Amino acid sequence: MSEKRTSLWENGLIWFGAGVSIAEILTGTYLAPLGFGKGLAAIILGHLIGCLMLFFAGVIGGKVRKSAMETVKMSFGQKGSLLFAFLNVLQLVGWTAIMIYDGALAADGVLSVGRWVWCLVIGVLIVLWIVIGITNLGKVNVIAMSALFVLTLILSKVIFLDSGAVGMAADESMTFGAAVELSVAMPLSWLPLISDYTREAKEPVKATAISAVVYGVVSCWMYVIGMGAAIYTGEYDIAQIMLKSGLGIAGLLIIIFSTVTTTFLDAYSAGISSESIVRKWNGKHVAIVVTVIGTVAAMVYPMDNITDFLYLIGSVFAPMIAIQIADFFLLKRDASSQNVQLTNLIVWLIGFLVYRMLMHVDMPVGNTLPDMAITMLVCVVASKVGKER
């Protein structure tokens, strides 16, 4: 029996679902102090950088038909890749909890029955999504995405056409570089996941391009909704925006379905990454466990400001993908037969430290691009020096 492959349409739908998210709208609100013009420029520049990296990561996995964490072995070796598989599972558990928390908080603002109840509802729906499975979600996703698309159009209309409010004045509390970095961070957080989906595609390179473009456009749109809401309605609480818009139950559906379709990807990929750590584990079962942990964490811990979490993701995964790009596209080498590729691990550590240092420097293009350029340069030089020795 031939393996079922995903179409370009299905890949586009998956990444549309990833982009429509409460977390992205909330992150967009952080950019309001820049004002609309500068904020929009930062969103677009950040997403261009982030989605280009997303594309490269997806192409690597798609071409070799390997999951995201399996492709990491090509640069860091069998055991060396375990560090990133572990860090990836950790960030995905974090994202699962944050997404459920944000969704439940917003849902409770529309229909107040208690945040923990909404955490449970969203958690159960995510488990249902995992059980149905990615290749069987085609029709379910089409219905969910169509509804989300219409409802987010309504939300955009309410914010930009019906608010009637004068935009708030820009201030200096957010620099342009920091705004770019917050815009890079979202696509970058998907970077260790994209190959989990492109490896299943009939046409991996085309599917990767469509995935990166669809996600980039939708994510920009979510950021703009959040930023616009904060600027034009003076409201940072997404539930309040929806209530003021008269989007009671419809708004509730946006919140729940967008949370489920995005968080499903986090939990599913945590399961796939866990298989790289312990071969005997079943990815689907781990995904369900991750959802349960995320649901409990969302009930117990407050997770209102995620900027530090986003910067941490950037500092871990920007140098990682820089090394992968250098190895796959420039040096054309594969370390997957090795136990540990020590040189690349040292280069990654340098890249991680450089990113953390760049956080204290205000650069117009953010930290990710300079950090990746430095990491790739160090990687290529280290490779040449190693050969000469």
Q: Which residues fall in each region the model found?
A:
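Extracellular loop-to-transmembrane helix junctions
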Residues: 29-58, 80-82, 215, 370, ...
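Juxtamembrane transmembrane-helix boundary signature
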Residues: 44-76, 83-89, 383-387
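Membrane-interface "cap" regions at the ends of multi-pass membrane proteins
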Residues: 1-38, 136, 175-180, 192, ...
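Membrane-interface loop-to-helix entry segments
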Residues: 117-159, 170-171, 208-215, 310-322, ...
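Membrane-water interface regions at transmembrane-helix termini and the short interhelical loops
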Residues: 29-33, 59, 98, 102-110, ...
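Transmembrane alpha-helical segments of multi-pass small-molecule transport proteins
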Residues: 14-18, 84-89, 110-132, 145-156, ...
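Hydrophobic transmembrane alpha-helices that form the core helical bundles
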Residues: 80-113, 260-276, 319
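C-terminal membrane-solvent junction of multi-pass transporters and transport-like membrane proteins
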Residues: 171, 323-389
